Amino acid sequence: MPSRIGIDLDNTILRYDEVFYSLAQAELWIDRNCLCDKDAIKKELTKNAESAEKSEKRWQQLQAWAYGKDISKALVYDGLFNFTKQARLRGDELFIVSHKTEFSNFDPSVNLRRSALDTLGQRGFFKSIIQGGLGFSLQDIFFASSL
């Protein structure tokens, strides 16, 4: 029996570790020997900032960049394309869910949802399977604001 499967966009479909790392490195906010991992980067920001407030502002700035103007640099997790194609062959219904707000409080000039959709389009998510894509439509994408 086919299933209905929702896949979380951020940190399940798209991987941001390298984006956060390169952005934080460019700003000289982390040491070069910091692990390329979001949690490690956040800890490094805390260690290197003059205050907790400064650390949190830097983290929010990184998030605004990574989920907005630099989202196209995020990598698709290994195995996602194969999983999606196999699920479609089984007849499963697939959906993408994101709790991304429309605009970042830190940088309201970039529409985070539009940036995400553009990136998915560039990666072939909206192309048919026959065209080498993943066969999603805009109706398969759900943005749900967090409380």
Functional labels for PLM-detected ranges:
Residues 71, 80-120:
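Substrate-recognition element of Asp-dependent hydrolases with the DxDx(T/V) motif
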Residues 43-85, 89-92:
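Metal-dependent phosphoesterase signature
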Residues 1-58:
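Active-site neighborhood of HAD-like aspartate-dependent phosphohydrolases
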Residues 92, 106-147:
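C-terminal cap/substrate-recognition subdomain and adjoining C-terminal extension
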Residues 12-14, 19-20, 100-104, 147:
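Short, solvent-exposed loop/turn segments at secondary-structure junctions
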Residues 7-9, 74, 97-99, 143-145:
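Short His-Asn-centered micro-motif
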